[in-house]
Amino acid sequence: MPEPSISDLSFTSFVTNDDNLFEETFNFYTKLGFHATRSYVKDNRSDFELTGISTDSIKEIWLESFPLSEVVEASGGRELRKPLQESVGYESEALLGYSPYQSGGVVIKLRLSNHDLEKNNDLPGEVTFFTASIDKLKAKLIEIGAEIIPSKIDLVEFSTRDPMGDVISFSSYPSLNSKKITSPDFFLHPKKEVRSEESIVEQVKSEEGKKKIAIITSGGDAPGMNAAVRAVTRAGIFYGCKVYACYEGYTGLVKGGDMLKELQWQDVRGLLSIGGTIIGTARCKEFRERWGRLQACYNMVSNGIDALVVCGGDGSLTGADLFRKEWPELIKELLGEDKITKEQYETHRNLTIVGLVGSIDNDMCGTDSTIGAYSSLERIIELVDYIDATAASHSRAFVVEVMGRHCGWLGLMSGIATGADYIFIPERPPSESNWKDDLKKVCLRHREKGRRKTTVIVAEGAIDDQLNPITSEEVKDVLVEIGLDTRITRLGHVQRGGAPCAFDRFLATVQGVDAVRAVLESTPAIPSPVISILENKIVRQPLVESVAQTKTVSAAIEAKDFDKALQLRDQEFATSYENFLSVSKYDDGSYLVPESSRLNIAIIHVGAPTSALNPATRVATLNSLAKGHRVFAIRNGFAGLIRHGAVRELNWIDVEDWHNTGGSEIGTNRSLPSDDMGTVAYYFQQYKFDGLIIIGGFEAFTALYELDAARAQYPIFNIPMCCLPATVSNNVPGTEYSLGSDTCLNTLSGYCDAVKQSASASRRRTFVVEVQGGYSGYLASYAGLITGALAVYTPENPINLQTVQEDIELLTRTYEEDDGKNRSGKIFIHNEKASKVYTTDLIAAIIGEAGKGRFESRTAVPGHVQQGKSPSSIDRVNACRLAIKCCNFIEDANFQVKHNANLSADERHLRFFYDDGVKTSAVSGKSSVIDDNTSVVIGIQGSEVTFTPVKQLWENETHHKWRKGKNVHWEQLNIVSDLLSGRLSIRTT
């Protein structure tokens, strides 16, 4: 049967004014396998029948060659066509004909016209059709006496003429860019397609010509390295490469043999939750010598490897780049010594190097984060939280020493996240002459305010401004001098241990996949790249430049140019240091603003509880108190304000230990101000609020919009108001990150690790894990990526029967390949709102039924456990960053009003004035108070902090029914997850 035109026409018309020729042509095409789907006669018509009919037609017959799609065997040996949506490779109706396993069909319109027609026999009409049975079609044409015209075009087999004289050509190529198809089984039975001997030979040749990549983990180990090994291995296999593990770092390259081993898909299963690196790491002295690199070159060429993905610190990456520079000389030397053949020399004369930065210190320039850094930070805050309990019990001081010989990132971030009193980091060394006195003042002041514990963080590379080391013992002695019972805790290599946190699993995975792409896209002219993350985007930076800039930091410190050293760190480092000072040191009264500029700032929690509400409230309070502002907590949400006027002023001692406290200390619920807007306005006026920070999820976003919309009726709402998104669902428009979502992901990763362990122990059990998120698939997509789920179901990607069938096929295949081995636990991630039909229980039941004893299924619903207990390090650090930004926003907006000499006292209070009868904002000077951009949602877009007017978000970027933003910024996570689980391979094959 002829199939769709490779000329990309949706239909073609053949016209005649001869009734007999019209019938003859109709019979010709029906003999070729076309079917009549519509007929029209002018004398018998209705308005409906005129749709698509030419005005000059007396008769029309529409002939169609139906799309070829998969068939299945039914009872009695009959074959039934599968629904197109369930066929192999189906994408959508819009893409029909572009999928390799479906064709779009074609329509021929035969028209009998009432006009005189002149046929140009020298330039006849011509169209080309695809057929998967070219020989059968040719035989059929000969049988009916049609003319066979040899073709002069490569893609066209032959042509013929229909009774109207139009040239009809036939091809075995579905499109101009596709491969030749000579069997209908390609469409009807995709799994039964018969492979020719030529295709088998081609495959063998392609096996020999596959790119071979080696993955190395070198230098100090870091949590997340195993995730990188898994990602590089599976992405390499997916893209048609062979991937080798180089064991024990560069030692494996030098020694070769069994220390260079090819990795298969199943070799890297279950690695996401394992800390360290299973392929080992070591510092190799031999590789530092030229003879060692020569031997490494020989071992690589002998195995056909000419690409290296190196995961390590700046030393490991420097060695890799040197190896690439020397490679042409090394391989030429091997050829001269007859250790390799001329063919090997020509094939592998260029080496490709791609770097992944694995370092807990986060000391590499050109990237916002390195693999392992946040896991190490997570370990530090977990241990310091434990220390806090005993320190408070005994009213002790603890000096905690953390890693960071040349970089103070761990020291700075752990200081913020643990509520430390003081930190020592190399980029901001204290004065040699007075650091001891300064330390005493800060710690004594905090004690006088009622604090029972003292925490001082010391980076192992801490120095004073004269480059003298500051040791933990020295710090202890200073604290003992002021009468504090002091202990020293050196965390040491505990910081490297344990399972990687959610962010490091994500980072190592997406960077590992991009590393393989970088290898395949590399040319000898492209400098060796290092895969980095900047502004929340995966980018490639020149390896040499990144390493050189990193070494510049150490040089700047040695030259006592500490400002330059600080600038060379990532863009948030200096800001974070200032944030730490604002909540720990600036409470000494040195940063008080004039009384006329002091504000009353209200904070309210709205929506479901998350683990980061308290840390954000703590920072906003401490930062504001340090400047002389008053901070009021609205207790129990808007319901508490409306019913009881529940407002409480917060003091320093009230919030100082909220840095590691989950839930909400001031209470939260889903009530909205619209429940009684007048009462809300009354209490705002009573307490003379100058600004409002609403911390919460979609309800907080809605509350801000309602307050903004009520400004025309209640002038008190003209105060600057800011919504700080805090929800596990991460569904607030205007931001790519919400406080609490990282804690939730860490909780989910631990939960799923435990579930997978149970599944692995049972050998033949699969768990379907239901996660929260509402109609936002962010949580499910992210969790699926970091837990290695076989399949992820989200509201953004509707589930159908074909999807479930593919996933069960993948599950069955995976069980067959695992053969009951360890680390073979399998999970599916299902968003709670992914489908009304394909629920978590139904998916589990379908899996269990499909298993037929080979495997079984269970459901696992973590429920509100996902909210987490203690906030994660990322949530604590970002709570500090965003809360201070909110305070600054409120201060700036008030400054413009309170210091405007042209406004009267009443106009300053109302925050608007009338200009020639037009109501005008005192903040923006615009003619509409509602549009003065002082009701905003703070968000993180990439790495940039943004303030977006709530009205703009509500009207343009919000799905109100689904309670989320329109921007699905996490879609790429699903693609990477499907690639590494094998799901994408099922769909492409």
From Swiss-Prot:
The protein's Enzyme Commission number: 2.7.1.11
Top-level taxonomic group: Eukaryota
PROSITE patterns, sorted: PHOSPHOFRUCTOKINASE
Record's protein name: ATP-dependent 6-phosphofructokinase subunit alpha
Positions bound to beta-D-fructose 6-phosphate 1: S359, I360, D361, M403, G404, R405, E460, H493, V494, Q495, R496
Family: Belongs to the phosphofructokinase type A (PFKA) family. ATP-dependent PFK group I subfamily. Eukaryotic two domain clade 'E' sub-subfamily.
Transmembrane segments: none
Entry's Gene Ontology BP terms: canonical glycolysis; fructose 1,6-bisphosphate metabolic process; fructose 6-phosphate metabolic process
InterPro entries (UniProt xref): 6-Pfructokinase_euk, ATP_PFK, Pfk_N, Phosphofructokinase_CS, Phosphofructokinase_dom, PKF_sf
Cofactor(s) in the UniProt record: Mg(2+)
Active site: D361 (proton acceptor)
UniProt region (N-terminal catalytic PFK domain 1), positions on chain: 1-585
Protein's cellular compartments: Cytoplasm
Annotated catalysed reactions: beta-D-fructose 6-phosphate + ATP = beta-D-fructose 1,6-bisphosphate + ADP + H(+)
Complex and partners: Heterododecamer of 4 alpha, 4 beta and 4 gamma chains.
Binding annotation for beta-D-fructose 2,6-bisphosphate 2: R765, R858
Pathway: Carbohydrate degradation; glycolysis; D-glyceraldehyde 3-phosphate and glycerone phosphate from D-glucose: step 3/4
Originating organism: Komagataella pastoris
Keywords: Allosteric enzyme, ATP-binding, Cytoplasm, Glycolysis, Kinase, Magnesium, Metal-binding, Nucleotide-binding, Transferase
UniProt binding sites for beta-D-fructose 6-phosphate 2: R396, R487
Stretch list, region Interdomain linker: 586-599
Residues that, per the record, bind beta-D-fructose 2,6-bisphosphate 1: 670, 727-731, 772-774, 832, 864-867, 963
Annotated region (C-terminal regulatory PFK domain 2), positions in chain: 600-989
GO cellular component: a single term: 6-phosphofructokinase complex
